Amino acid sequence: MDVKLPKRKKNALLITLPSSIKWEDYEKELKAVEDESQVMNFKVPFLPKNIHHIKRVYLVYQGNIVGWQKFVGTSDKQFKCTTTDKNWEGKFIQRTGPFHKINKIPYKGFQGFRYYDYED
């Protein structure tokens, strides 16, 4: 008899850093939120749904998943980036805390976000 395991809910989001952004510049933003006194905002065309179980946001950079940060929520707002001084408006996925590097996992980049499943 085959046993069917319950389907796990996707417990993370996956985003892609645009190729136009240099990692050295991005590290400055990662450093700014390391102590959780600020959040990083990632612009998306629409907000994810059913996010109560989302714990992490994984980052794709140059064709690889390279690490994750703690997911703290979503917003629909206007703000000025404290690192780049650029004005932003729209829908955002928010994350904060230290960036946890992982062994690279090949993954093709995309726009927006995707739901992702991880195991500790």
Role assignments for model-derived ranges:
Residues 66-75:
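Short beta-strand-centered aromatic/proline hotspots
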Residues 1-53, 61, 80, 86-91, ...:
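Compositionally biased, charged N-terminal/linker segments
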